[in-house]
């Protein structure tokens, strides 16, 4: 699992299939959040990144891993791939979007003003 200094995060398991979700601390610089998200893909920790529009309840997955995986389970991202990810995440961070499959209690916290952004990375299912 990648570690970035000064970035608070925790690992939670929400789904019955054991998929791992990483919740990244909220009041961080946008580029650090973007870097963390695609770094999890580079290291093979994450299977995909999913954008969730909480207001409308819509999910839009950015699936990079399945097409990019190599035999050693690492992901080969080009500079263009990385720039695209940065832009997508930056655009989402600029708006009330969440990078995740959202858990209901996160909504209540957000609406109560306890957090204005949560970034999740969908991780690989633990064996």
Give the residues covered by each predicted segment.
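Positively charged, low-complexity terminal tracts
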Residues: 1-127
């Amino acid at each position: 699992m990648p570690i970035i200094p000064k970035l608070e995060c925790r690992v939670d398991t929400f789904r019955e299939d054991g998929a791992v979700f990483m919740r990244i601390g909220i009041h961080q610089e946008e580029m650090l959040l973007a870097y963390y998200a695609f770094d999890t893909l580079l290291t093979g920790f994450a299977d995909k990144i999913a954008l969730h529009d909480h207001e409308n309840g819509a999910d839009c997955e950015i699936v990079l891993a399945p097409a990019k995986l190599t035999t050693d389970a690492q992901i080969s991202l080009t500079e263009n791939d990385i720039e695209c990810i940065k832009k997508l995440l930056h655009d989402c961070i600029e708006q009330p979007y969440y990078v995740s499959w959202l858990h209901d209690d996160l909504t209540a916290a957000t609406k109560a003003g306890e957090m204005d952004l949560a970034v999740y990375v969908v991780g690989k299912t633990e064996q």
